């Protein structure tokens, strides 16, 4: 007998919300039962889901609006809410056990806990959180305990960096390191120069500029891999591409290793324990080659360099939208088995 599907609700139908929905609808072990977004109508929700400038048109089910409160994916009904206050969303009635909190607004434990009042059993925040435990699938998800009701799936960049850093640290030891992510545009940026009081550079036109920015992704690796706490930090350059980003991790190693030995170690892990999370390529790839890649981190063997046998620069690609959304669902599946 087939196991009961894991029932998922999504709060916030932005880039990650919509792509998590796409991932869920293409899998057999999970089921989308409800979506909440107070800022869009059901009809507009259908349009936003169906057409995607990066990932293309949805071709798996016919999509219809049954009524204001119901979408049909093929024959499958999905309940739609338009409720502003998370505690008022009746997840329980809709049958949602897990809620993906992808508004970007309710990222701390207290705010995300509001979903539990409406009947959700667990909440996964699709962003870093200052106080919810963070999990990176392939790195520390085994530390999840079933009494944790609110967790964070960390950031897309932490999901790219952590598997790579784990392999390097396990095999060779990391003394210290700096990360740079060359990162595609995201929704918080501006199409033309505009006001951005908290981040002045971030208010400059996204499609015209390389914009230096801060990121907590490298420090967050220290939360999911405590042995690296205080050893990594990093920054970001926002560049005018719409999806796919790349991490440059420059580290000092404890144990001397040739670049070939490092490549071999990463390749082994990518075919072993980390298969499906960490990838490995020796092809002459560029960013668009990774659109739709569901792995968290794809090591580019040809792009990295070594200065000496203890000082190396490693390069790893990630589809910051699709890879990350895939991990959100993987984390939920893992939690449901705990």
Curated annotation (Swiss-Prot):
Domain of life according to the entry: Eukaryota
Alphabetically ordered keywords of this record: Cytoplasm, DNA-binding, Glutathionylation, Glycolysis, NAD, Nucleus, Oxidoreductase, S-nitrosylation
Phenotypic effect of disruption: The double mutant gapc1 gapc2 has an impaired ability to enhance heat tolerance of seedlings and to promote the expression of heat-inducible genes.
Stored PROSITE patterns: GAPDH
Active site, UniProt feature: 156 (nucleophile)
Outcome after substituting residue 231 to A: In GAPCmut; compromised heat-induced nuclear accumulation leading to impaired ability to enhance heat tolerance
GO molecular function: copper ion binding; DNA binding; glyceraldehyde-3-phosphate dehydrogenase (NAD+) (phosphorylating) activity; NAD binding; NADP binding; salicylic acid binding; zinc ion binding
Pfam families cross-referenced by the UniProt entry: Gp_dh_C (PF02800), Gp_dh_N (PF00044)
Site features described as Activates thiol group during catalysis, chain residue numbers: 183
Catalytic activity: D-glyceraldehyde 3-phosphate + phosphate + NAD(+) = (2R)-3-phospho-glyceroyl phosphate + NADH + H(+)
EC number(s) on file: 1.2.1.12
Gene Ontology CC annotation, any one: peroxisome
Effect of residue 223 to A: In GAPCmut'; impaired DPB3-1/NF-YC10 binding, but normal heat-induced nuclear translocation and impaired ability to enhance heat tolerance
Outcome recorded upon mutating residue 121 to A: In GAPCmut; compromised heat-induced nuclear accumulation leading to impaired ability to enhance heat tolerance
Pathway it works in: Carbohydrate degradation; glycolysis; pyruvate from D-glyceraldehyde 3-phosphate: step 1/5
Effect of residue 255 to A: In GAPCmut'; impaired DPB3-1/NF-YC10 binding, but normal heat-induced nuclear translocation and impaired ability to enhance heat tolerance
Record localization: Cytoplasm; Nucleus
Oligomer and partners: Homotetramer. Interacts with PLDDELTA. Binds to DPB3-1/NF-YC10 in response to heat-stress; this interaction promotes DPB3-1/NF-YC10 DNA-binding ability to its target promoter.
Function (record text): Key enzyme in glycolysis that catalyzes the first step of the pathway by converting D-glyceraldehyde 3-phosphate (G3P) into 3-phospho-D-glyceroyl phosphate. Essential for the maintenance of cellular ATP levels and carbohydrate metabolism. Binds DNA in vitro. Together with DNA polymerase II subunit B3-1 (DPB3-1) and GAPC1, enhances heat tolerance and promotes the expression of heat-inducible genes.
Protein's UniProt name: Glyceraldehyde-3-phosphate dehydrogenase GAPC2, cytosolic
Gene source species: Arabidopsis thaliana
Source lineage: Eukaryota, Viridiplantae, Streptophyta, Embryophyta, Tracheophyta
Gene name of this polypeptide: GAPC2
